[in-house]
UniProtKB/Swiss-Prot annotation:
This is Glycine cleavage system H protein. The modification N6-lipoyllysine is found at residue 65. It comes from Proteus mirabilis (strain HI4320). Pfam families: GCV_H. Binds 1 lipoyl cofactor covalently.
């Protein structure tokens, strides 16, 4: 069973969201998602400074099996991307909740967090998919 850290929020499309304070959030894909995708070969990240709306496809994770869109779980401005993934996309596989993070958003509307899943809700979603 995949790890589902309790301190994170989750989107139904398998992104995780961690608050960094000051309305800033780090986004990545869950361990479950990277297991389904398999070994990452390339991650196409959004441009720093670009605006995204909730649900926008803003990044792509390419693995040996498939290419998968990654959706913005919050509206806001992209304030950072994980440059390490440029040469080491496998970090998404080896450390999805740590060094394999994808991008950071300065949230426009933090009430959107209310629509995200907690760890128990995400666990239920994953179990219902299997």
């Amino acid at each position: 069973m995949s790890q589902i850290p309790s301190e994170l929020k989750y989107a139904q499309s398998h992104e995780w969201i961690r608050s960094e304070g000051n309305g800033e959030y780090t986004i990545g894909i869950t361990e479950h998602a990277q297991e389904l995708l398999g070994d990452m070969v390339f991650v196409d990240l959004p441009d720093v400074g670009s605006e995204v709306d909730l649900g926008d496809d803003c990044a792509v994770a390419e693995s040996v099996k498939a290419a998968s869109d990654i959706y913005a779980p919050l509206s806001g401005e992209i304030i950072a991307v994980n440059e390490e993934l440029d040469g080491s996309p496998e970090l998404v596989n080896s450390d999805p909740y740590g060094d394999g993070w994808l991008f950071r958003i300065k949230a426009k509307d933090e009430s959107e967090l209310n629509d995200l899943l907690d760890a128990a809700g995400y666990q239920e979603l994953v179990e219902n998919e299997e």
